[in-house]
Each structure stands twice: as C-alpha cells, then as structure tokens.
Amino acid sequence: MSVQHWLDQWGIQLPANNAETCRLQVADDPELVLEKVPGGWLMAMRLGRLPSPMLLGVQLQLLQANGPFSALAPVHVAADSAGDLVLWVEVQEGHVDVPTLNNWYAKLCQGHKHFSPLLEAVPDQPRPASGARLFV
C-alpha cells in the first residue's frame, strides 16, 4: 500500500514533479510534512521551538514519548536542524495499509494537541531551591 492510496481518501495528490518534500493540510489538523526517504516516506508534524527554560515535567513527557510503551508509538519526538521539535513516523512503502496510516496520523495529531501547549515558553521566575528533587 502506498502513501498515495492513503491520501486518496482526502482527494490529495502527491506532487507530480517527484518532490522530495511536500507539505499538506488535512482539514483543520496541523500541517503534515511528507519527506521521501529510501524505501518510503517520513510523516512529520512540527511542534515548535524548544523552549528555554523548559519545565522538568515537560522534558520527562517528551522523553517518555520515545519509549516503546508510549501511547504514541511508533511516533517519535526529535529536534530538527533548526531547533524545532517534531513528531515523526517512518512509513515503508508497501508494508503499511491505509488503516495503519490513519492510526499513525491520528497519533501525530494527538501528540501535537498534547505537546504544543506544553512547549510555550515558561517565564523565567525564581524558584525555591530544595536539597532534593522528589517525583511522586
């Protein structure tokens, strides 16, 4: 099954010029970037700039998203060369069917909805110092 079969459900066509990267907008969802990789495509959604400072809880959630037991798996979080965080999943042509691609797309959207608000810059405010950090 190809990515084009998946896009057919929305009446979207991949560029005919054999572009390496294309940006798509499906309904009101965040922009989806498709980038050609050997043997398939990378589906990605930009989350935004890596904020500084970032709350420790947000850092831990981002790290957990890459774990094998994450609700978003097989979607991953990474930073691109511009310093933006992106959600991504690799699609191997001929190895994934349309329902699976729909599921992965839903996970990209779910991750975007969850993480985008958390990545807004945190005001630099003094925080009380403690001798230990406790996690509950």
Question: Where is each model-derived feature located?
Answer:
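Short, internal acidic amphipathic alpha-helical interface segments
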Residues: 46-86
